[in-house]
From Swiss-Prot:
Family the entry assigns: Belongs to the ClpA/ClpB family. Torsin subfamily.
Any GO molecular function: kinesin binding
Subunit-level organization: Homohexamer. Interacts with TOR1A; the interaction may be specific of neural tissues. Interacts with TOR1AIP1; TOR1AIP1 is required for TOR1B location on the nuclear membrane. Interacts (ATP-bound) with TOR1AIP2; important for endoplasmic reticulum integrity.
Predominant place of localization: endoplasmic reticulum
SUPFAM superfamilies, per the entry: P-loop containing nucleoside triphosphate hydrolases (SSF52540)
PANTHER family on file: TORSIN, TORSIN-1B
Reactions catalysed according to its record: ATP + H2O = ADP + phosphate + H(+)
Organism: Homo sapiens
Record-given protein name: Torsin-1B
Gene name tied to this protein: TOR1B
């Protein structure tokens, strides 16, 4: 916006100067100068008007850090690690005018813990239309890459899709869901785009964002959470350093992670492995209340309790964590 404003000012100044020196130049020269300045002003005005009615990729659009922080803190429950890491990673990346590589996040945890929800929050804070934006691209492994015998075809298609869309918008976001169901080797096709290259075939990928969502590593995360609970320590005491190293190694060695022996891990191209902790009873109740508010319903604590108690919890003896997180809250609330 600052650049556009400066250009408009420059164009206006050019018109003013052209008018004041009209007597000192030939009529044709003056006409050309005024015409050029008018063309610049007209283009900028057209571009501004166009972007009011159609989605434009505005690279200079700043990230509203306060709005992002509020969304994460008020809408994501029981995930203090994810909230902190994602906020710092995104704000740091977007505040860097010259990043050396794309931002790559790998989100891990059992179903219903908030991974997809966070990717939606991130998309909406980066592009106003969120997941509906032309600059946000969602890949679902079982839908887009179902056949193991077509790995080479998928790799070629993936490279072309990413190259074309980053060429159109440097700030593109790519989300890969169900990474644990992705055939090994497919994701390595994007390795050149995640590396520290200034350009690849004339295209810079340094301002793009890649997000991987996976259930892989959920068992490792749960074990750590349980160890803390059994030791009488709060879940909020769990730090990223308690999980990230174990998570990266575990995913690398897991044949069903989508990142098995992947060059993305081997070459340290994934910036953060972000654990999503299993949700407790109190977090499920938070999800029920949030869903009620989203539906415009008054909060009925009796219903909140009944829905939460209908969920199943594990381990068998302690019954601490919801085995489906908050995934079935919406459908269960329909019965009340």
């Amino acid at each position: 916006m600052l650049r556009a404003g400066w250009l408009r000012g420059a164009a206006a100044l050019a018109l003013l100067l052209a008018a004041r020196v009209v007597a000192a130049f030939e009529p044709i020269t003056v006409g050309l100068a005024i015409g050029a300045a008018s063309a610049i002003t007209g283009y900028l005005s057209y571009n501004d008007i166009y972007c009011r009615f159609a989605e434009c990729c505005r690279e200079e659009r700043p990230l509203n850090a306060s709005a992002l922080k509020l969304d994460l803190e008020e809408k994501l429950f029981g995930q203090h690690l994810a909230t902190e890491v994602i906020f710092k990673a995104l704000t740091g990346f977007r505040n860097n005018k010259n990043p050396k590589k794309p931002l790559t996040l790998s989100l891990h945890g059992w179903a219903g813990t908030g991974k997809n929800f966070v990717s939606q929050i991130v998309a909406e804070n980066l592009h106003p239309k969120g997941l509906k934006s032309n600059f946000v691209h969602l890949f679902v492994s079982t839908l887009h890459f179902p056949h193991e015998q077509k790995i080479k075809l998928y790799q070629d298609q993936l490279q072309k899709w990413i190259r074309g869309n980053v060429s159109a918008c440097a700030n593109s976001v790519f989300i890969f869901d169900e990474m644990d169901k992705l055939h090994p080797g497919i994701i390595d096709a994007i390795k050149p785009f995640l590396d520290y290259y200034e350009q690849v075939d004339g295209v810079s990928y340094r301002k793009a964002i890649f997000i991987f969502l996976s259930n892989a590593g959920g068992d490792l995360i749960t074990k750590t959470a349980l160890d803390f609970w059994r030791a009488g320590r709060k879940r909020e005491d769990i730090q990223l350093k308690d999980l990230e190293p174990v998570l990266s190694v575990g995913v690398f060695n897991n044949k069903h992670s989508g990142l098995w022996h992947s060059g993305l891990i081997d070459k340290n191209l994934i910036d953060y492995f972000i654990p999503f902790l299993p949700l407790e009873y109190r977090h499920v109740k938070m999800c029920v209340r949030a869903e009620m508010r989203a539906r415009g319903s008054a909060i009925d604590e009796d219903i909140v309790t009944r829905v939460a108690e209908e969920m199943t919890f594990f381990p068998r003896d302690e019954k601490i964590y919801s085995d489906k997180g908050c995934k079935t809250v919406q459908s269960r609330l329909d019965f009340h």
